[in-house]
Amino acid sequence: MRKFTAFACGTGAGLAAFYLQRLRDPKQTAWVHNSWTNSERPVDSWALWDSNWDCRDPKSLVRPQKNEQPQEQNRYNSDFEKNHAKSARHIILIRHGEYLDVGDTDDTHHLTERGREQAKFTGQRLHDLGIKWDKVIASTMVRAQETADIILNEIDYDKAKVTNCAYLREGAPIPPQPPVGHWKPEASQFFRDGARIEAAFRRYFHRAYPDQTKESYTLIVGHGNVIRYFVCRALQFPPEAWLRISINHASITWLTISPSGNVSIKYLGDSGFMPVKHLTNRIPRDAKNVV
């Protein structure tokens, strides 16, 4: 009888606590229910995909129909087709190889021997993928330039056609969440670098132009912070989350922008094609002026 009484009391207390919680916070119960069982109704409005994130959704570029007359419908449909993307864009992002942070200027920040080998492995990997490149773009910083040069020795692309872009230089894109104690740039650096890196994102990340008739492949050689920020922005994740991601030196990140504007990620920091001894993501311990 004592065991039965204890069991009944325990069950009753549990049920009472459950219903009391429901009475106190019914919204929280609905939140849990929706988050696990109803994918069509996101809990947070931030989870909704913005289909016009690049301001190139044809619906936003075409003058709306004035009426339902056939002539007006034909005009709208014709304008819509002229502004509608028809092919996908593949953007492949490569982080530079390992380098030494020696000296106070970028001119002295050269790749280590291992960094050069990493870049060669990446170039060979890209060659093996058999991609026909439409564009190759590189940050103007020395370590990215050296990485791009080594990669270009391995792939089929004319070095004279490479675009060098200062917008892609390394920097502090946005204050990260959660904050970290070992890396705290001044607010002025975020103010300066953030606008530039966001401008780079808007320059290179968008759906294909309407006159593009086949899938395109763009190779961008850049930096860890910039690439991680690009990934968060492209996938419409909170951009403040960029520092939660880690990518290795000379790794491959592959994003695809479909004609509809949807974005998917194929690789994130892929470096599995390298020997284990070549897997690095930080400046070597023997570097000077480590930041």
Curated annotation (Swiss-Prot):
Its membrane topology: Single-pass membrane protein
GO molecular function term, any single one: protein serine/threonine phosphatase activity
Compositional bias per record (Polar residues), positions renumbered to this chain: 67-77
Highest taxon of source: Eukaryota
Gene3D superfamilies in the record: Phosphoglycerate mutase-like (3.40.50.1240)
CDD domains attached to this UniProt entry: HP_PGM_like
Reactions mediated catalytically: O-phospho-L-seryl-[protein] + H2O = L-seryl-[protein] + phosphate; O-phospho-L-threonyl-[protein] + H2O = L-threonyl-[protein] + phosphate
GO terms under cellular component: mitochondrial outer membrane
InterPro entries xrefs: His_Pase_superF_clade-1, His_PPase_superfam, Mito_Ser/Thr_phosphatase
EC numbers: 3.1.3.16
Region (Disordered), start-end ranges: 59-78
Pfam families per UniProt: His_Phos_1
Locations listed in the record: Mitochondrion outer membrane
Keywords: Hydrolase, Membrane, Mitochondrion, Mitochondrion outer membrane, Transmembrane, Transmembrane helix
GO BP, sorted A to Z: positive regulation of mitochondrial fission; protein dephosphorylation
SUBUNIT field: Interacts with Pk92B/ASK1.
Similarity field: Belongs to the phosphoglycerate mutase family. BPG-dependent PGAM subfamily.
Function: Displays phosphatase activity for serine/threonine residues, and dephosphorylates and activates Pk92B kinase. Has apparently no phosphoglycerate mutase activity.
Protein name: Serine/threonine-protein phosphatase Pgam5, mitochondrial
Source organism per UniProt: Drosophila willistoni
